[in-house]
Amino acid sequence: MKLPLISILIPTVPERVEQLIQLTALLFNQSTGLPVEILSLSDNRARSIGMKRNALLHIARGKYIAFIDDDDTVADDYCATLCDMAKVDVDVLCFNQISRWNKEESIVEFRIDHAIFGQYMPAGITKRFPWHVCAWRRELAQQCVFTDKQWGEDADWVMQAFELARVEAYSPKILHYYAHMDEASLAK
């Protein structure tokens, strides 16, 4: 069996099963015929999100890996665009994101020459180093470890990845949609 180009990794919790079903249906529909594997990991909250991310990363087989949280969504051409971008040999596949932090929205431009924690620019463009939602070369991603915690594990991981990325492919498309609402967060 041929290895996939892209592994999409989705950590989840039982409280978000309906959102997971919608997300995986969207991904299954758009990945038909493409070299994409979609993996999710749910449990009874015995593992932190950091440990779930590490477990998914360990079993991923794609040339590139990208995480999508169960309460996020992606563009209709997410899989096709990443597969097209993955034809080149780079460290990370970068793109743009719509980020909603509580009621403030920003376009996030992920590029390797941006700061890790670029200033959030409501109603503007936030420039950030590529986080775990971008598609990272698996061998590089596996050199980094998500910390065993429920919140902030992604920031800990990206600070390690920052040292490894040298070459990117970039699409100006908005491929990922992130939404955070303090009152709805399950990261406790």
Description of each model-found segment:
Residues N44-A60:
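Glycine-rich, basic loop-to-helix element that forms the pyrophosphate-binding segment
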Residues C79-V108:
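Conserved donor NDP-sugar-binding/catalytic core segment of glycosyltransferases
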Residues Q160-Y177:
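Catalytic donor-sugar/metal-binding loop of nucleotide-sugar-dependent glycosyltransferases
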Residues I65:
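Short aromatic/hydrophobic "clamp" motif used to bind/position activated sugar donors
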Residues D69-T73:
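The conserved acidic donor/metal-binding loop of glycosyltransferases
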Residues W151-W157:
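Acidic donor-binding loop at a coil-to-helix junction in glycosyltransferase catalytic cores
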Residues L3, Q22-P35:
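Short, acidic, metal-binding catalytic loop of nucleotide-sugar glycosyltransferases
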Residues A115-W136:
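A recurrent flexible, glycine/aromatic-enriched loop bordering the glycosyltransferase active site
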